[in-house]
Protein backbone atom coordinates (compact mmCIF):
# COMPACT_ATOMS: atom_id res chain seq x y z
CA UNK A 1 0.00 0.00 0.00
CA UNK A 2 3.00 2.27 0.51
CA UNK A 3 3.29 3.23 -3.19
CA UNK A 4 -0.47 3.70 -3.41
CA UNK A 5 -0.87 5.93 -0.38
CA UNK A 6 0.01 9.28 -1.97
CA UNK A 7 -2.18 8.87 -5.09
CA UNK A 8 -4.99 7.48 -2.91
CA UNK A 9 -4.73 10.49 -0.60
CA UNK A 10 -4.75 12.92 -3.55
CA UNK A 11 -7.83 11.27 -5.06
CA UNK A 12 -9.69 11.20 -1.75
CA UNK A 13 -8.73 14.80 -0.93
CA UNK A 14 -10.17 15.88 -4.28
CA UNK A 15 -13.43 14.04 -3.64
CA UNK A 16 -13.84 15.19 -0.04
CA UNK A 17 -12.95 18.83 -0.74
CA UNK A 18 -15.75 18.91 -3.31
CA UNK A 19 -18.28 16.99 -1.24
CA UNK A 20 -18.34 13.85 -3.39
CA UNK A 21 -19.24 10.71 -1.44
CA UNK A 22 -17.16 7.63 -2.18
CA UNK A 23 -15.91 4.29 -0.91
CA UNK A 24 -12.49 2.74 -1.36
CA UNK A 25 -12.97 -0.69 -2.96
CA UNK A 26 -10.69 -3.35 -4.44
CA UNK A 27 -7.30 -4.37 -3.10
CA UNK A 28 -6.84 -1.33 -0.85
CA UNK A 29 -10.19 -2.05 0.83
CA UNK A 30 -9.18 -5.69 1.29
CA UNK A 31 -6.17 -4.60 3.31
CA UNK A 32 -8.44 -2.65 5.64
CA UNK A 33 -10.33 -5.85 6.44
CA UNK A 34 -7.22 -7.86 7.24
CA UNK A 35 -6.50 -9.39 3.84
CA UNK A 36 -3.16 -8.29 2.45
CA UNK A 37 -2.28 -9.06 -1.14
CA UNK A 38 -0.38 -7.28 -3.86
CA UNK A 39 -2.35 -4.54 -5.55
CA UNK A 40 -1.05 -1.99 -7.99
CA UNK A 41 -3.97 0.37 -8.47
CA UNK A 42 -6.57 2.31 -6.52
CA UNK A 43 -10.30 1.74 -6.99
CA UNK A 44 -12.88 4.22 -5.74
CA UNK A 45 -16.65 3.90 -6.09
CA UNK A 46 -18.05 7.44 -6.37
CA UNK A 47 -21.65 8.56 -5.84
CA UNK A 48 -22.82 10.73 -8.72
CA UNK A 49 -24.74 13.80 -7.48
CA UNK A 50 -28.10 14.20 -9.20
CA UNK A 51 -26.99 11.42 -11.60
CA UNK A 52 -25.00 14.05 -13.51
CA UNK A 53 -22.38 11.67 -14.85
CA UNK A 54 -21.11 14.16 -17.43
CA UNK A 55 -20.30 16.81 -14.80
CA UNK A 56 -18.49 14.33 -12.54
CA UNK A 57 -16.46 12.89 -15.44
CA UNK A 58 -15.48 16.42 -16.48
CA UNK A 59 -14.48 17.38 -12.92
CA UNK A 60 -12.31 14.27 -12.57
CA UNK A 61 -10.68 14.63 -15.98
CA UNK A 62 -9.98 18.32 -15.33
CA UNK A 63 -8.37 17.62 -11.95
CA UNK A 64 -6.43 14.56 -13.10
CA UNK A 65 -5.38 15.08 -16.71
CA UNK A 66 -3.15 12.00 -17.14
CA UNK A 67 -5.38 9.30 -18.60
CA UNK A 68 -4.56 5.75 -17.57
CA UNK A 69 -4.73 2.93 -20.11
CA UNK A 70 -5.25 5.17 -23.19
CA UNK A 71 -5.23 2.06 -25.42
CA UNK A 72 -8.43 0.77 -23.77
CA UNK A 73 -11.78 2.08 -25.05
CA UNK A 74 -13.41 4.44 -22.58
CA UNK A 75 -16.17 3.18 -20.34
CA UNK A 76 -18.65 5.91 -19.37
CA UNK A 77 -18.83 4.54 -15.81
CA UNK A 78 -15.06 4.48 -15.23
CA UNK A 79 -12.72 7.44 -15.20
CA UNK A 80 -9.24 5.90 -15.22
CA UNK A 81 -6.45 8.35 -14.46
CA UNK A 82 -2.80 8.18 -13.53
CA UNK A 83 -1.77 9.94 -10.32
CA UNK A 84 1.94 9.80 -9.52
CA UNK A 85 2.30 6.88 -11.96
CA UNK A 86 -0.42 4.86 -10.22
CA UNK A 87 -3.68 3.95 -11.95
CA UNK A 88 -6.67 5.31 -10.06
CA UNK A 89 -10.06 4.08 -11.25
CA UNK A 90 -13.01 6.27 -10.29
CA UNK A 91 -15.98 3.93 -10.76
CA UNK A 92 -19.17 5.96 -11.03
CA UNK A 93 -21.98 4.42 -8.99
CA UNK A 94 -25.26 3.57 -10.67
CA UNK A 95 -28.51 3.98 -8.71
CA UNK A 96 -29.48 1.03 -6.53
CA UNK A 97 -27.07 -1.39 -4.93
CA UNK A 98 -23.96 0.63 -5.78
CA UNK A 99 -25.37 3.58 -3.81
CA UNK A 100 -25.62 1.25 -0.81
CA UNK A 101 -21.92 0.44 -1.09
CA UNK A 102 -21.18 4.10 -0.42
CA UNK A 103 -23.89 4.52 2.24
CA UNK A 104 -22.57 1.50 4.16
CA UNK A 105 -18.89 2.48 3.90
CA UNK A 106 -17.01 2.89 7.17
CA UNK A 107 -14.40 5.48 8.09
CA UNK A 108 -11.00 3.80 8.54
CA UNK A 109 -7.62 5.16 9.60
CA UNK A 110 -4.88 5.05 6.96
CA UNK A 111 -1.49 6.10 8.38
CA UNK A 112 -2.54 9.38 9.97
CA UNK A 113 -5.51 10.21 7.77
CA UNK A 114 -8.84 8.52 7.18
CA UNK A 115 -11.04 7.46 4.29
CA UNK A 116 -14.40 5.85 3.66
CA UNK A 117 -13.85 2.15 2.96
CA UNK A 118 -16.32 -0.34 1.51
CA UNK A 119 -17.77 -2.70 4.13
CA UNK A 120 -16.42 -6.24 4.20
CA UNK A 121 -19.88 -7.51 3.23
CA UNK A 122 -20.14 -5.30 0.16
CA UNK A 123 -16.59 -6.17 -0.82
CA UNK A 124 -17.54 -9.86 -0.73
CA UNK A 125 -20.67 -9.23 -2.82
CA UNK A 126 -18.71 -7.32 -5.47
CA UNK A 127 -16.04 -10.01 -5.64
CA UNK A 128 -18.51 -12.88 -5.92
CA UNK A 129 -20.35 -11.10 -8.74
CA UNK A 130 -17.04 -10.34 -10.52
CA UNK A 131 -16.24 -14.04 -10.17
CA UNK A 132 -12.61 -14.09 -11.28
CA UNK A 133 -10.25 -16.62 -9.73
CA UNK A 134 -8.44 -13.99 -7.67
CA UNK A 135 -11.80 -12.62 -6.48
CA UNK A 136 -12.77 -16.01 -5.07
CA UNK A 137 -9.41 -16.22 -3.27
CA UNK A 138 -10.17 -12.80 -1.77
CA UNK A 139 -13.66 -13.95 -0.72
CA UNK A 140 -12.21 -17.01 1.02
CA UNK A 141 -9.60 -14.86 2.78
CA UNK A 142 -12.26 -12.36 3.91
CA UNK A 143 -14.42 -15.18 5.26
CA UNK A 144 -11.48 -16.50 7.28
CA UNK A 145 -10.43 -13.06 8.50
CA UNK A 146 -13.87 -11.59 9.29
CA UNK A 147 -15.80 -14.79 10.10
CA UNK A 148 -18.67 -14.24 12.54
CA UNK A 149 -18.44 -10.46 12.21
CA UNK A 150 -20.00 -10.62 8.74
CA UNK A 151 -23.71 -9.97 8.19
CA UNK A 152 -24.41 -13.18 6.29
CA UNK A 153 -28.11 -12.41 5.84
CA UNK A 154 -27.24 -9.16 4.03
CA UNK A 155 -24.62 -10.86 1.84
CA UNK A 156 -26.83 -13.80 0.91
CA UNK A 157 -29.85 -11.60 0.23
CA UNK A 158 -27.90 -9.49 -2.27
CA UNK A 159 -26.15 -12.48 -3.81
CA UNK A 160 -29.55 -14.12 -4.26
CA UNK A 161 -30.79 -11.03 -6.08
CA UNK A 162 -27.70 -10.87 -8.29
CA UNK A 163 -27.85 -14.61 -8.98
CA UNK A 164 -31.43 -14.24 -10.19
CA UNK A 165 -30.87 -11.02 -12.18
CA UNK A 166 -27.75 -12.41 -13.87
CA UNK A 167 -29.27 -15.88 -14.29
CA UNK A 168 -26.28 -17.33 -12.45
CA UNK A 169 -27.64 -19.35 -9.50
CA UNK A 170 -24.14 -20.73 -8.93
CA UNK A 171 -23.09 -17.34 -7.49
CA UNK A 172 -25.07 -17.98 -4.33
CA UNK A 173 -24.38 -21.71 -4.09
CA UNK A 174 -20.64 -21.25 -4.61
CA UNK A 175 -20.60 -18.56 -1.93
CA UNK A 176 -22.52 -20.81 0.48
CA UNK A 177 -19.95 -23.54 -0.19
CA UNK A 178 -17.14 -21.08 0.62
CA UNK A 179 -18.86 -20.14 3.89
CA UNK A 180 -19.25 -23.81 4.84
CA UNK A 181 -15.59 -24.42 4.03
CA UNK A 182 -14.45 -21.46 6.16
CA UNK A 183 -16.64 -22.61 9.07
CA UNK A 184 -15.20 -26.14 8.87
CA UNK A 185 -11.60 -24.95 8.78
Which residues does each PLM region occupy?
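Compositionally biased terminal segments of proteins
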Residues: 1-185
